[in-house]
């Protein structure tokens, strides 16, 4: 039997319905400011998608575009101005940044309460300490996608392949909050296929097309493919399609985690607006 398809579009629409319901009870409109440097085609497309979705929800969204050679100090000055602007709830600087700009310095410059990407060290610390904060959108999207399809993570053996600061590490923290038993595997993990075969839930986020084959996957596992790799004009995941022969459920690429990342960004923007005004989400 073919694996169940875990559609990110369906789960994302449920998130948007919740956001719309919450917005109806508010006396203000959340505001999102996105900064993009240069004209990298992927960045242009991602920013356009985020702005379009924000506007569709009724947010006040604005994209600021600067030349790729914008000095780092000029970018930091603009972020400082947006931090001080009471009309702005969320700030997002589209990554990757040009080589002359220190990404970590930029991420640390964004006020933690306006950090809708969830990358500020204070928010990272809150994630791991069990506190309230704004957390990275893709890991949030993975957890929300699993919950949408009724996956109870408590006590589950979950293996995350990939230890990036954007996906793997924060996802491990979020899964621990759900009482999962988490293994964080990576390129130096010995006998990676043996480790992945233990997983009841397997999440792969390494950026290597079709790395995971069906022999790597436990019969009846739930598999989440975070990878998006462009190969000869096609988008391929990190998981080979043959995994559908053994998995119970599998996210597609595209159409799986991607839509959830944007949905959780919209959720973070609302949370930022509420946290900044009331200190708690409503």
From Swiss-Prot:
NCBIfam families reported for this sequence: PRK14173.1
Binding site residues for NADP(+): 162-164, 187, 228
One Pfam family matching this protein: THF_DHG_CYH_C
Similarity-based family: Belongs to the tetrahydrofolate dehydrogenase/cyclohydrolase family.
Enzymatic reactions: (6R)-5,10-methylene-5,6,7,8-tetrahydrofolate + NADP(+) = (6R)-5,10-methenyltetrahydrofolate + NADPH; (6R)-5,10-methenyltetrahydrofolate + H2O = (6R)-10-formyltetrahydrofolate + H(+)
Pathway this chain belongs to: One-carbon metabolism; tetrahydrofolate interconversion
Claim: Membrane is one of the keywords in the record: no
Keyword Hydrolase: yes
Name of the protein: Bifunctional protein FolD
The species this protein was found in: Thermus thermophilus (strain ATCC 27634 / DSM 579 / HB8)
Keywords assigned: Amino-acid biosynthesis, Histidine biosynthesis, Hydrolase, Methionine biosynthesis, Multifunctional enzyme, NADP, One-carbon metabolism, Oxidoreductase, Purine biosynthesis
Function text: Catalyzes the oxidation of 5,10-methylenetetrahydrofolate to 5,10-methenyltetrahydrofolate and then the hydrolysis of 5,10-methenyltetrahydrofolate to 10-formyltetrahydrofolate.
InterPro entries: Aminoacid_DH-like_N_sf, NAD(P)-bd_dom_sf, THF_DH/CycHdrlase, THF_DH/CycHdrlase_cat_dom, THF_DH/CycHdrlase_CS, THF_DH/CycHdrlase_NAD-bd_dom
Family annotation (PROSITE patterns): THF_DHG_CYH_2
PANTHER family in the record: C-1-TETRAHYDROFOLATE SYNTHASE, CYTOPLASMIC (PTHR48099:SF5), C-1-TETRAHYDROFOLATE SYNTHASE, CYTOPLASMIC-RELATED (PTHR48099)
GO biological process: L-histidine biosynthetic process; methionine biosynthetic process; purine nucleotide biosynthetic process; tetrahydrofolate interconversion
């Amino acid at each position: 039997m073919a694996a169940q398809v875990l559609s990110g579009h369906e789960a994302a629409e449920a998130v948007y319905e919740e956001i719309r319901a919450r917005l109806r009870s508010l006396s203000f409109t959340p505001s999102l400011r996105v900064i993009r440097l240069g004209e990298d085609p992927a960045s242009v497309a991602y920013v356009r998608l985020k702005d379009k979705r924000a506007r569709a929800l009724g947010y006040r969204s604005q994209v600021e575009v600067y030349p790729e050679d914008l000095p780092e100090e000029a970018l930091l000055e603009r972020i400082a101005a947006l931090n001080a602007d009471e009309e702005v709830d969320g700030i997002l600087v589209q990554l990757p940044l040009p080589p002359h700009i220190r990404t970590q310095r930029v991420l640390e410059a964004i006020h933690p309460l306006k950090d809708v990407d969830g990358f500020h060290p204070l928010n990272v610390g809150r994630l791991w300490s069990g506190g309230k904060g704004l957390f990275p959108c893709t890991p949030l999207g993975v957890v929300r996608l699993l919950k949408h399809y009724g996956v109870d993570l408590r006590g589950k053996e979950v293996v995350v392949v990939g230890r990036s600061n954007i996906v793997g590490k924060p996802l491990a923290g979020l899964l621990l909050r759900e009482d999962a038993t988490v293994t964080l595997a990576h390129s130096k993990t010995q006998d990676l296929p043996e480790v992945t075969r233990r997983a009841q839930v397997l999440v792969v986020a390494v950026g290597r097309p079709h790395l995971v084959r069906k022999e790597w996957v436990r019969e009846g596992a739930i598999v989440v493919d975070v990878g998006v790799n462009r190969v000869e004009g096609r988008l391929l995941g990190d998981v080979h399609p043959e995994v559908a022969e053994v998995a119970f459920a599998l996210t597609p690429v595209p159409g799986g985690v991607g839509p959830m990342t944007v949905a959780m960004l919209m959720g973070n923007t609302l949370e930022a607006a509420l946290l900044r005004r009331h200190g708690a989400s409503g």
